[in-house]
Amino acid sequence: MQRSLGRGLRLAALLAAAICLYTGLLLAAYSFPDEWISDNVGAAVGMLTEEGNMVGGYANYFWHTGFSITDNLTDMRIYQGLLRDGRSVTDAAMRTDYARYWHGYAVVLRPLMIVMSIVNIRYLNMMALMALFLVCGWKCRERFGWRTAAHFCGGLLMSFLLIAPFCQQYMPVTFLALAGSAAVLCGWKAARNRLYELFFLLGSLVCFFDFLTFPVLALGYPLACGLLQMVWDGEGPAPIWKKTLLLSVAWVLGYGLTWVAKGIIGTLLTEENVLGDILSQAAFRTTGAFYTDTGAVDVSMRSAVLINLETFFMGANIGAFALMLLVEGVYALRRGRLENWPQALALAAVALWPVIWYCVLQNHSRLHFWMTYKQLSVTVFAGCSALRALGAVREDRSCGEVQKRA
């Protein structure tokens, strides 16, 4: 009891410090004049407008399908919102025009726009994501073997990772998913004793930097990496299941409380009912219909889940996932241990997190399926990792015996 109370106090202190830091950083980011960035912002909006020549004003890359869509409309809103346009620093920092989100990306993007164009920012995005992608793949190969590295990388590629650098809206959650995974994979010895704080902070950072895009990516990938580390360390079913559930709860609390805090801070600083807007949007995104030019579209859990499954598991993705499951299944049958099945089930549970998200946020998941489908890459990685976990103890013991003999 005392241990849980202490952890709760640490998380509360972490949240308070994070909220103060977020608010201060946003105020600082909007403190310098628009003239410093107006030329680059104008050029960015012009480029996004030129690209957005598809139906609905969105831009498609490569395949000209909903699978590969980039949200240029929201990207234009992101770049236009970097300008104060006569607003006070406080109103601009709280984004009174779109107040229900933190818009933490402005802390990075606004200073960068002083010296960089949108083209150079996209190059920077690409280099950052590819560097983290390679680091995570290498560490998976080093720790768990080449098959796990293939599952990690393959799941992300199946979600069209390559398009993320070109869409500023997709960058924060993709970057945080990879950065969180890298923290777990590269710093496991230090992170394993602070996992609750790590996942709580990760959820908070996703809320701060991201719109409501595909947040489960930044929960599922780091969590699956952490659970695999625990399996390889010889942890039993009870601690692994405990971590599966409690780390997920910590992430959700970090995300949810940070979102509520934006409502409180925004309301206090701008004297607008930001909290009311957040609560009404939360209610709208979890239930009800949405409206198009042709009328109302009814939303159900089933329709939200199905449209995301149909978008993700198309063509090559079906074959790639089936091949990964087949290869891992053969290895599990030949070299696995059935007593590992409770640990494997914990990873299989993580594979269901995107589906649970679709059911809870059914309106958002149905309306924005062309980006929320990306969360199913968690299903690919965690599902294959569940089979991988069946053979972990035997392989780990063999490695240990070799090391002792050496």
Regions from the PLM with identified roles:
Residues 29, 244-328:
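Membrane-lumen/periplasm interface segments of specific transmembrane helices
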Residues 104-125:
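Juxtamembrane segments of multi-pass membrane glycosylation machinery
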Residues 107, 153-176, 203-208:
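Aromatic- and kink-enriched transmembrane "portal" helix at the membrane-lumen/periplasm boundary
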Residues 126-149:
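Transmembrane-helix motifs of polytopic, lipid-linked glycan transferases
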Residues 133-137, 314-341:
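Hydrophobic, aromatic-rich transmembrane alpha-helices
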Residues 151-153, 338-362:
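Transmembrane alpha-helix segments characteristic
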Residues 195-223, 243-257:
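Membrane-interface alpha helices of multi-pass inner-membrane proteins
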Residues 367-389:
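Hydrophobic/aromatic-rich transmembrane helices and adjacent perimembrane loops
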